[in-house]
Amino acid sequence: MWKQILSKLPNKKSSKHEHRGREHGGHSSSSSHTSGASTSKSTDNGAAKSHAKNASPAGKSAASDSGFKDGNLKSSGNNNNNNNNGVFTPYEALPSFKDVPNTEKQNLFIKKLNLCRVVFDFTDPTKNIKEKDIKRQTLLELVDYVNSPNGKFSEVGIQEVVRMVSANIFRTLNPQPRENKVIDALDLEEEEPSMDLAWPHLQLVYELFLRFVASPETDTKLAKRYIDQSFVLRLLDLFDSEDPRERDCLKTILHRIYGKFMVHRPFIRKSINNIFYRFVFETEKHNGIAEFLEILGSIINGFALPLKDEHKVFLVRVLIPLHKPKCLQMYHQQLSYCITQFVEKDCKLADTVIRGLLKYWPVTNSSKEVMFLNELEEVLEATQPPEFQRCMVPLFRQIARCLNSLHFQVAERALFLWNNNHIENLIMQNRKVILPIIFPALERNAQKHWNQAVHSLTLNVRKIFHDLDPELFKECLAKFKEDESKAAETEAKREATWKRLEELGVRKAS
């Protein structure tokens, strides 16, 4: 009996060893055979074992068996498991889809996806030219395959698409160093964007993924297991890429994911909000704010009425504070569209928006002030009289300051508000409140503004008020002259007081 038990022990070890061998890339017998062949060609045991592992054929796990790690391993000459050209072996083109029967196309699709998980180093254009071309041609074939009707994608196919895309696009972004994180929009505009050297491959990977997400052959229920929240978060991180081509692709893909995967919609909105919070209140540095706002503009446009409280909170806590950063110019057009969409959907929000603009109104940045005036006109165009009346006093105090600005573009843009018929009607309906607020600014411009265009526009606005309500105009003019006279008297008294103090100081000194 003891002999029988003891006789079984070696077999268990052998079985365990064989099982372990399978875990590491094949049967133990084939592994030892390959290792022996490699050892005869190389004196380095480590390199031989690595070579044996990396020689496994393509298949569902071909990329992992070949030592390729998703998104982490670039093809360079620094690894033990490559040949003299600095390429992982083997890396050869697979047959074309048209050269295999329909029953084999799914398997070939997966093999080609695994082949494309290898990430090449594009910093040296002379390295791996042949292999880079093989990958490019394979990606082109995959794009055509995904775009053509070949039946529903299997779960394995979906998983491998996501793995291949992840291996290629998810990487550490290396932004160009800047001395200051907070730099003005002019400097940002003059700086040329940094283009990713790997774009010849990245572009095709993005194109493939876009068509895959949009394809009717992609089962959303299956795909959401792999295009999950973790994947979406990593996708959002890529929006900070300095390459505008990549951000444009990401914008389209994220919009498609938002439309197709309804389960992810709240998570996507919340994650974008968090990026905005960090941008506004911490870094003031992000390359993808305009693209995010463009996506949100489309989303806001589809909001059902009445608006949910969640969406109103988003307007107040996220969109309005986005007027604060110095680099507003880089995304103002998209932000203004989002803001206007809210007011057009619910005119009662006009008062909230206008007061928000006044809160963040620039004091020392004239070009930013012009942008605020442009946006203000769009908001006022969608504003109804009740909402206008609630905010007109603080609003026209600010407009009066703009009218008196020595920066002619600010004063000119403020005067252009009277060219809008809807805004002019709102002003004239409430002229008894508005004219006394802005009359001093109009009169000073008419008397002594240095810019001829501003002077002419001011006279036109004065004439509009005079023709519509001459009595009110006379009252305002009389009040202005009285205030100016009092101000002159106060100034004269102040000067006389200072003069007496100076004389007193001279007497004491002598």
Swiss-Prot record:
InterPro entries for the chain: ARM-like, ARM-type_fold, PP2A_B56
Induction of the gene: Induced by epibrassinolide.
MF annotations from Gene Ontology: protein phosphatase regulator activity
Region: Disordered, residue numbers: 1-87
Quaternary state and interactors: PP2A consists of a common heteromeric enzyme, composed of a catalytic subunit (subunits C), a constant regulatory subunit (subunit A), and a variety of regulatory subunits such as subunits B (the R2/B/PR55/B55, R3/B''/PR72/PR130/PR59 and R5/B'/B56 families). Interacts with BZR1. Interacts with BRI1.
Membership in a protein family: Belongs to the phosphatase 2A regulatory subunit B56 family.
Source species taxonomy: Eukaryota, Viridiplantae, Streptophyta, Embryophyta, Tracheophyta
One Pfam family this sequence matches: B56
Protein name: Serine/threonine protein phosphatase 2A 59 kDa regulatory subunit B' eta isoform
GO BP terms in the entry: brassinosteroid mediated signaling pathway; defense response
Gene3D superfamilies assigned to the protein according to its UniProt record, in alphabetical order: Leucine-rich Repeat Variant
Keyword Nucleus: yes
Gene that produces this protein: B'ETA
Main location class: nucleus
Purpose: The B regulatory subunit may modulate substrate selectivity and catalytic activity, and may also direct the localization of the catalytic enzyme to a particular subcellular compartment. The holoenzyme composed of PP2AA1, PP2A4 and B'ETA acts as negative regulator of plant innate immunity by controlling BAK1 phosphorylation state and activation in surface-localized immune receptor complexes. Required for the formation of the PP2A holoenzyme that negatively regulates brassinosteroid signaling by dephosphorylating and inactivating BRI1 in the cytoplasm.
Reported phenotype of the disruption mutant: Delayed flowering.
Ranges of biased composition (kind: Basic residues): 10-19
Recorded superkingdom: Eukaryota
Compartments, record wording: Nucleus, Nucleolus; Cytoplasm
Keywords: Brassinosteroid signaling pathway, Cytoplasm, Nucleus, Plant defense
GO cellular component terms given for this protein: cytoplasm; nucleolus; protein phosphatase type 2A complex
Biased composition (Low complexity): 27-42
